[in-house]
Amino acid sequence: MRVIFLDNRDSFVYNLVDLTAREAGVQVFRNTTPVATLRDALEPTAEERTAGERPLLILSPGPGHPRQAGHMMEILDVALQEKIPTLGICLGFQAMVEACGGVVAPVGATHGRTDRVELTEAGIEEPSFSAIAETPRPGEEATHGYISIARYHSLGTRSLPESLISLAHTHDGIVMAARHRSAPCIGLQFHPESILTPAGPLLLRGLLADLTLSPSISRSSHE
């Protein structure tokens, strides 16, 4: 597996790079890298073509609004059009929302805490999420269970565009994970690389495997 990692200048981005490198070969590019260079890097090698594989794109966390993050929005548009397996994390997730026609806005600053967030029906059907799902504690109500995750963000969304489906959300409706309905693209508002996401390494390993398994997935969608 080969990963093209777009660095959005987050302070802890190499924690995520190191975690990813346990599962795949990783090439890191700053978000100021020309789109043509990124497109070339995302082209399958001869060996990958023979094996029916192609690189996976990771859009890293970072500061600011996704539309101000170098060429991230442009390469994400390419990835969605060409159905390149893509994982967006924090700022990368927000880029997914904006690229699909949604709006990212202030939702209140949450920096450095673990939250238990509720899985949706679509979320519990994702193998990577069901593998780390926690049963409700006494007094909690969650039909499909919870996951414990690390939050470091002030922007987010409570409403997704039609092409995205929620996998997890906070008690007050902030979307914490989503997938594209027809492209192999998943986004996490939270940080799997943080020690405050206890099952983060397991989740990341599963997502990398799931996204590269079927490059042109098209699954049924839940409302």
Give residue spans per PLM region.
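Short amphipathic alpha-helix with an adjacent loop that forms part of the alpha/beta core around
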Residues: 35-53
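Extreme N-terminal starter segment of soluble prokaryotic enzymes
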Residues: 1-4, 55
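N-terminal beta1-alpha1 ligand-phosphate binding loop
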Residues: 3-20, 31
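Cysteine-nucleophile active-site neighborhood
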Residues: 53-126, 131
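Catalytic beta-strand/loop cores that center a nucleophilic Ser/Cys/Thr
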Residues: 128-182
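Phosphate-binding/catalytic loops
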Residues: 128-129, 189-198
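A short beta-strand-loop structural module common to alpha/beta enzyme folds
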Residues: 25-35
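Acyltransferase
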Residues: 195-223
